[in-house]
Amino acid sequence: MTHQVSVLHQDKKFDVSLRPKGLKEFCGQAQLTERLELFLNAAIQRGEVPGHCLFFGPPGLGKTSLAHIVANTVGKGLLVASGPQLVKPSDLLGLLTSLQEGDVFFIDEIHRMGKVAEEYLYSAMEDYKIDITIDSGPGARSVSVDLAPFSLVGATTRSGMLSEPLRARFSFTGRVAYYSDEDLATILRRSSNLLGIDADASALYEIARRSRGTPRLANNLLRWVRDFAQMREGNCINSDVAEKALAMLLIDEWGLNEIDIKLLTTIMNYYQGGPVGIKTLSVAVGEDVRTLEDVYEPFLILKGLLKKTSRGRMVTQLAYNHLKRCSDNLQSLGEEK
């Protein structure tokens, strides 16, 4: 089996250029970063390898960046793997034995590891040992192999799917939450400086408030607005230009996109506002269940537009009000033209 394993310098140039190198550069998540800084520095001061860390939260909020920061803080190497690729012990063997003392082993989507591989990881995390089976058949024997002490960093969008034995082996657990518009605007200012984009503060705030509290999306939208301004507005990036660019992507003032609106209007128009089951909704809007649950629902629930009940999903009165207001705005714009 071929592992998609990478180290820091193999990331895409764009992502690396924007990725914060240390906790001082990491904007937002103040309580989490304060605890993490204390946790790491205490271990460094004692001359120990930091304990294992677990970060959980919606996609795009900086869990991978935090893994890189852990490695940068302890000054060691970073090895990256993806949970779905770790199915059996042999998938882990080469990775674990390649680690040097103090290295950080980052497993993204750790909740999707195979059960057998996960159990194989227990002794590696707790005792820095693994058992290797030599030969096969009647002559097979198990040999215990010592590993170099390392720090495992796991990231998951679904912490509830982690088994209790695995969760209990993490010394540090941190929830990465959605960002405020102000924090996103600060992140975008840093990104625009790094990328050489000349944008005024009002434009950055306009992008921030439509970015669903997610830095990854904010940076992607910043690039889109840059491209739009380059081709349509003579490289001028102000709030009006940002609004035009984001309207072209069908992103409204709350950050709702075409799929969000389709999801809400489907429940309203075809299921009388709900409740409707997630599988039925998946077929109706043409998105798989996992994408709806991980990408779209958390933000809609956070904004108070959707609620989950024991019988299914329901839209709220706020959703009706918001979509009516958007419709009225579009109609008035059409009349002005």
Curated annotation (Swiss-Prot):
Its EC number is 3.6.4.-. ATP binds at residues 18-19, 60, 63-65, 126-128, 169, 179, 216. Its main location: cytoplasm. Residues 253-337 are annotated as: Head domain (RuvB-H). One of its GO terms (biological process) is DNA recombination. Mg(2+) binds at residue 64. GO terms for molecular function: ATP binding; ATP hydrolysis activity; four-way junction DNA binding; four-way junction helicase activity. Has 3 domains, the large (RuvB-L) and small ATPase (RuvB-S) domains and the C-terminal head (RuvB-H) domain. The head domain binds DNA, while the ATPase domains jointly bind ATP, ADP or are empty depending on the state of the subunit in the translocation cycle. During a single DNA translocation step the structure of each domain remains the same, but their relative positions change. NCBIfam families: PRK00080.1, ruvB. Homohexamer. Forms an RuvA(8)-RuvB(12)-Holliday junction (HJ) complex. HJ DNA is sandwiched between 2 RuvA tetramers; dsDNA enters through RuvA and exits via RuvB. An RuvB hexamer assembles on each DNA strand where it exits the tetramer. Each RuvB hexamer is contacted by two RuvA subunits (via domain III) on 2 adjacent RuvB subunits; this complex drives branch migration. In the full resolvosome a probable DNA-RuvA(4)-RuvB(12)-RuvC(2) complex forms which resolves the HJ. Belongs to the RuvB family. This is Holliday junction branch migration complex subunit RuvB. It comes from Chlamydia abortus (strain DSM 27085 / S26/3) (Chlamydophila abortus). The lineage of its organism: Bacteria, Pseudomonadati, Chlamydiota, Chlamydiia, Chlamydiales.
